C-alpha cells in the first residue's frame, strides 16, 4: 500500500523533528501516522480509532509540535491521558520528539506529584502540558494553568477515561478552552458518550480507522507474574534459575536499569551484559558477538538498543518492565522463537500496571496465563538436576585416574579407620557448590498473596481525591491486625528534625526506593540529628546498600541495622513518633504517602497500598467487557513446569 512507502520527510515535518526521529530510529510512518499527520498539519480536527500500540502518540505529537511557536512561553498543546503512567510516557515521547527544537519545554501534571514541583514547572512557561483530568482540572480551578494561548488539544485513550469515570472532568476542561483550537481524539472504541463529545466539541473531524496489525505468536509460550513483595531483581534470579534456556534477553525501560539488572545478575553468577543507547557501536557489536557464540548468556536491553537484534540462541525473553504499548511487547517477544524454534516470554506486571496487561491481551486477542514465583522446592530440584548433569558430564568426558589416586589418599582417617564413602562424597559435593547451597531455604513472602483482579483501573484518582469532597465516616471500617514486633528490625538513618525531615519524607523514601508497601513500615521516631525506623526482617544486603545511598531532602540516609525491634512497652520518649501511625499494617500517616505510593498535599486521600491495591472498604470494580476473561478457578501455573 502507498502509505507504507511514505517517509516522514514526505509528510512535511520540519528538520528538527526529522532529526529527532532519525536519532530515535524511526524509519517510516505507521499507518495511523501516515493518515493523521497531514490532517493535523493542515489544522483539521481528527478522530482516530486505533488500538494502543499503533503509534498514535507520534501521530498527534509530531504535527502539533511542528505547528507550535517556540518563542511563545505559554501552553499551546494540552494532552489529556487517563493515567499518570500514560501521561509520563506521552510527556517523555514529546520531549524526545522536540529535543532539537530550541526553547520547547514539556511538563507532565498528574495526581500524586507535589504541587510546588508542578507550579515551578508551569512558571517556566512550557509549550506542551500533558496531564490527567483530575489534576488538570485542579490547576484550572486554582488559576495556575493558563490555556488562553492553546492551539491544540488531544484526548488520548478517551474510552479509558470514560471507563474510569473521568469523562465529566474531561468535558469540564474542554468547556473552558477558548474557541479556535484544534482537537484530536483517539480511542480504541467509540461508545456513545465519546461520540457526544465529538459532536459537541469537534469541528467536522476527519475519521481515521486503523486495524491492529499485531498478531499472536503460537510458537512462543507467554506468561506473566504479578510483582509483589519480593524485589524484582530477586524474582528475576529465581525465574532464570527455574527456567531452562539457551540465551535470554531482558527488557527494561531505562539505561540505568540495564546496568543495575546486569550487576545484580553478575552477583548471582550469571554471565550477562547491558545493552543501551549510551554504548558505542563497537561495544554493542562485541556484546552481540559474545551472545551469538555462547560466551554471553543474558543481555539486558532497552527497546531502542535492541532494535534489529536477531540471535537464534535466544529462547527466553523477560519483560522486566512492562512496555507501554502492545506493539513494543510483540516486538520484544519476537526476539525469541526464531528459526523455527520454540520460545518463552515472561512478563513482570506490577499491580498498578494491570491496564497495560489488559491492553496487550485485548490487542493480541488472547489471555496470558499467570505463573507463580518459583518456590524453594522447585529451585532445589533444579539445582540438583543441574549439578547431577555436570557430574555425569565429568564421568563421561574426563580422565579421572589421577583424581582416584588422590581420593585413595584421603579415604582413610588419621586413626587408620576407613572413611565412609558417602560422607566423603557429601563433603566434596558441598565444597564443589561453594556458598551456593543445593537446598534452597523457603522465603517468607513480604506480604500476603492476593489474587490479580480484573477490576476497574482507576488508580489515577488517588492523587485527585482531595478535589472530590470528604470521604465520610470511617468508624465502621474493620481495623487491621497489627504485625508482631518480632518480625521487625530497627534501623538508624542519619537524618532528623534539624534537617527539616518529617515522618512523611521517610515513609515516601522507603516505600519508593525499597519497593516496600508503606503498610509494612513500622514505628518511626525522629530525633535531632537522626531517626529510627522499624522494617521487616530479612532485608537483602543490596537493598540496605541502596538505602544507604538514598537521599532524603538531599541528605544521604546512611542506613544501618541496630538490631531487633523492641516491644512497645519497653520504649520511652526521646523522639517524635510518626503522626497518626499505627505501625505495621496500620492506617496511613497524616500528610504522608498513601498506600498507592503517592504524596498528597494535606488530606488523607484515597487509601491504597503502595502496590496499588485498595484497603478494605473499596468500591467494587466494574467488569471490562472488552478484555478477555480470566478463569481464576483454574489457578496459576508454575513457571517452567507443566501448564
Swiss-Prot record:
Name the GO cellular-component terms.
Answer: cytosol; ribosome
Gene Ontology MF: a single term: ATP binding
Q: Which UniProt keywords apply?
A: ATP-binding, Cytoplasm, Helicase, Hydrolase, Nucleotide-binding, RNA-binding, Stress response
Q: What is its EC number?
A: 3.6.4.13
Q: Where does ATP bind?
A: 50-57
Asked if the keyword ATP-binding belongs to this entry, the reply reads yes
Q: Which InterPro entries match?
A: Cold-shock_DEAD_Abox_C, CsdA_RRM, DbpA/CsdA_RNA-bd_dom, DEAD/DEAH_box_helicase_dom, DEAD_box_RNA_helicases, DEAD_helicase_DeaD, Helicase_ATP-bd, Helicase_C-like
Region: Disordered, residue numbers? 440-482, 557-643
What's a GO biological-process term for it? cellular response to cold
State the protein's name.
ATP-dependent RNA helicase DeaD
Source organism phylogeny? Bacteria, Pseudomonadati, Pseudomonadota, Gammaproteobacteria, Enterobacterales
- Gene that produces this protein: deaD
